[in-house]
Amino acid sequence: MCKGLQVAIDGPASAGKSTVAKLVAKKFNYVYCDTGAMYRAVTLAVLNQGIDPKDDKKVAEIARQIKIDFEPGEIEQRVFLDGKEVTHDIRLPKVAANVSAVAAVPAVREEMTKQQRQIAENGGIVMDGRDIGTTVLPQAPVKIFMVASAYERARRRYAENQAKGINTTSLEELQKAIELRDKKDSTRKVSPLTQAPDAIKLDTTNMTIDEVVSEISKIIKKTQDELA
């Protein structure tokens, strides 16, 4: 049997990467490495130890000391911090309020990249983000670059917010925000959003989630056959 592959899914904000990555991981019984959850776990550890999230030096020390693991769960993926399950704790409002400050520390990003590589070492993993195929897992045999028009991404986010009962700005405002985020992501100095030369570009503007999952699944199966 072919060993599980490393699957890297990159793309701009609101392209549906996480939704698709989770479904693909479930389909192949792979681990989904939620990179955002890792930064939340660091934030939780920082708060639990009574450290100021704005104290870059101490925050970086915590990031280097902790160990984060993922395990597939029935309903959602389980997250562990130093062996203790924190799946729900990392979603607490106090964590959400401080995660941006923690994630902005360069030493934290460096450490998380290192841990993400360790998690992916044995394969059988799906990871999504902005720089997975270019920076975190440049050797991944499957690299997908998911794109969709700014209007379509804004429309999806707008519909999602309405379904969740979240008060949101107009569709036009959402589109402007997404276009601004695209510009920031693609022009930042550290790990900018760019398509890896060997990544397969997938324009999902006119595709359903099921169609995207099906397309990526075909790519994974084809790669498995080639490497078998």
UniProtKB/Swiss-Prot annotation:
<feature type="binding site">
    <location>
        <begin position="11"/>
        <end position="19"/>
    </location>
    <ligand>
        <name>ATP</name>
    </ligand>
</feature>
<keyword id="KW-0418">Kinase</keyword>
<dbReference type="GO" id="GO:0005829">
    <property type="term" value="C:cytosol"/>
</dbReference>
<protein>
    <recommendedName>
        <fullName>Cytidylate kinase</fullName>
        <ecNumber>2.7.4.25</ecNumber>
    </recommendedName>
</protein>
<dbReference type="GO" id="GO:0036430">
    <property type="term" value="F:CMP kinase activity"/>
</dbReference>
<dbReference type="InterPro" id="IPR011994">
    <property type="entry name" value="Cytidylate_kinase_dom"/>
</dbReference>
<dbReference type="Pfam" id="PF02224">
    <property type="entry name" value="Cytidylate_kin"/>
</dbReference>
<keyword id="KW-0067">ATP-binding</keyword>
<dbReference type="GO" id="GO:0005524">
    <property type="term" value="F:ATP binding"/>
</dbReference>
<dbReference type="GO" id="GO:0036431">
    <property type="term" value="F:dCMP kinase activity"/>
</dbReference>
<comment type="similarity">
    <text>Belongs to the cytidylate kinase family. Type 1 subfamily.</text>
</comment>
<dbReference type="GO" id="GO:0006220">
    <property type="term" value="P:pyrimidine nucleotide metabolic process"/>
</dbReference>
<keyword id="KW-0808">Transferase</keyword>
<dbReference type="GO" id="GO:0015949">
    <property type="term" value="P:nucleobase-containing small molecule interconversion"/>
</dbReference>
<dbReference type="InterPro" id="IPR003136">
    <property type="entry name" value="Cytidylate_kin"/>
</dbReference>
<keyword id="KW-0963">Cytoplasm</keyword>
<dbReference type="InterPro" id="IPR027417">
    <property type="entry name" value="P-loop_NTPase"/>
</dbReference>
<keyword id="KW-0547">Nucleotide-binding</keyword>
